[in-house]
């Protein structure tokens, strides 16, 4: 009887020790295609979105509390915004004054030129309201990045056809 008790005690101790070990992960932690990812942390939750190209719904949203275990919780847009045609690329999260913004690239229906639009919601999993294009520049404007410095907001982006020109600060 004592041998059985000792064996059960050792098995329980081993199981407890294994359960307390750190969990390891292997890449990718999100399976599938999440190109041009953007990640934001709000409170204790991380949110990631990425390029969806031509596939609807547009810009998938995944959530995680540990950066290892991710769940898809929705999309920025279920339907494409009216002004857009295609090429739904490079969404960029930004949080400001209690709102969540997504700056994104899409081609306009009117002239097939890519530009940067913005959508706003109360949370990354909320219903986003599209506000249309905010950057239309030259042949195309893509890949927005938002920066706040000393209370001022700046946006940077890539523009085609400017290969041999210096970086400019536009006001």
Model regions: which residues?
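Bacterial Sec-dependent N-terminal signal peptides
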Residues: 1-22
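Carbohydrate-active catalytic/glycan-binding domains of CAZyme proteins
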Residues: 18-171
């Amino acid at each position: 009887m004592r041998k059985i008790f000792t064996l059960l005690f050792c098995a329980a101790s081993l199981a407890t020790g294994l359960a307390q070990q750190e969990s390891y992960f292997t890449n990718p932690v999100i399976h599938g295609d999440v190109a041009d990812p953007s990640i934001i942390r709000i409170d204790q939750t991380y949110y990631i979105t990425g390029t969806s190209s031509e596939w609807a719904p547009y810009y998938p949203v995944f959530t995680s509390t540990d950066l290892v275990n991710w769940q898809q919780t929705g999309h920025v847009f279920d339907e494409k915004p009216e002004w857009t045609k295609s090429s739904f690329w490079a969404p960029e999260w930004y949080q400001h004054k209690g709102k969540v913004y997504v700056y994104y690239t899409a081609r306009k229906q009117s002239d097939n030129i890519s530009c940067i639009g913005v959508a706003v919601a109360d949370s990354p999993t909320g219903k986003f309201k599209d506000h249309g294009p905010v950057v239309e520049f030259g042949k195309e404007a893509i890949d927005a990045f938002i920066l706040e410095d000393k209370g001022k907001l700046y946006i940077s982006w890539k523009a085609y056809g400017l290969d041999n020109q210096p970086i400019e600060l536009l006001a």
